[in-house]
Amino acid sequence: MPITIAVDAMGSDKAPTPEIEGALQAIRHFDVRVILVGKQDVLREHLGAHAHPGRLPIEIVHASEVISMHDKAALAVRSKRDSSMRVGLRLVREGKADAFVTAGNTGAAMATAKMVLGALPGVDRPALAAVFPTEKRTAAILLDVGANVDCKPQNLQQFAIMGEVYFRTVFAGKSPHARSPRVGILSIGEEETKGNELTREAYKLVKTLPLNFVGNVEGRDLFNGNVDVLVCDGFVGNVALKISEGLVKTVREMLKESLQQTIARQVGFLLSRQAFVDFKKRLDYSEYGGAPLLGLKGAAFVGHGSSNANAIKNAIRVAAEYVEHRVNEAIAREIAAASEKLGNHHSSAKKEEGEEARA
């Protein structure tokens, strides 16, 4: 039976075109069913331009409101009760969809997901995990990249557990280290004593876990392929992510400018074109889809606001893989197994349950 993915069709900068085209690509390549959530008339018009909606495994669910990129997250989440984000996440909570994908306002997406779905038992704070390429042709993940600006050491310990589970399950067969992912803490030095109070205390907690913990990892080693799961607070993670995105863009432009300087270089480029195509693809964020919010009672993925159809297609793919590998069930088991060491018997997850009903 196909996995059903609810897509916020009004989320991206150029919505709904990337969402609709990405959904159409996804149903052609993967065994999935897609629910497009948004303004019904707009979606029917755009979808009808591509194919007859009734002949596709695509359903449209109406949502009268849209949370824009300029909306303040906290206010929009509370006031726009019929937003495409909120309606899509409700579909997951009600079992009508297996996962939710949005390329909309990141802050609003994270806040809405926490409110509508709630956290898994034992999870204090869900974390946003970003997948990035390494020089060894394997992927790695960084979390948190923005869901929690301020963290406690036990939060980073839980991030390590959730990130390790995600990598071990979803990257099985894709990475030589999937059976025993190497977990590290992003810090300013490799020694246990380096870093601030948060990273030093987190180090003590993470090393007590039955994980392949490699210790502290410096920022310069982010892409060298020597670590599979890198843990940090959301402030540091988001800064690292944005710097990486900016660096990739700069390198591309510098390379393009350099290759155009002489005829000899242009000829060299033509002779090596396939290598450059491969290089570009490895650095293309759209190939990695969306970032999962780990630790929720449901699967939710957040993509880049500038997502194109390929990014949406791949976000649907990774969301389906997440569901297929039962990542949430695995996270719940590992968190429960470590609960005594974590000391989180009074999880904030209980406080979040039913929060939407009170909103």
Curated annotation (Swiss-Prot):
It catalyses: a fatty acyl-[ACP] + phosphate = an acyl phosphate + holo-[ACP]. It holds the Pfam family FA_synthesis. Its main location: cytoplasm. One of its GO terms (biological process) is fatty acid biosynthetic process. Its EC number is 2.3.1.274. Keywords: Cytoplasm, Lipid biosynthesis, Lipid metabolism, Phospholipid biosynthesis, Phospholipid metabolism, Transferase. It comes from the Bacteria. One of its GO terms (molecular function) is phosphate:acyl-[acyl carrier protein] acyltransferase activity. The keyword Protein biosynthesis does not apply. Pathway: Lipid metabolism; phospholipid metabolism. InterPro entries: FA_synthesis, Phospholipid_synth_PlsX-like. It is found in: Cytoplasm. The keyword Signal does not apply. GO terms for cellular component: cytoplasm. Belongs to the PlsX family. Homodimer. Probably interacts with PlsY. HAMAP family: PlsX. Catalyzes the reversible formation of acyl-phosphate (acyl-PO(4)) from acyl-[acyl-carrier-protein] (acyl-ACP). This enzyme utilizes acyl-ACP as fatty acyl donor, but not acyl-CoA. This is Phosphate acyltransferase. It comes from Koribacter versatilis (strain Ellin345).
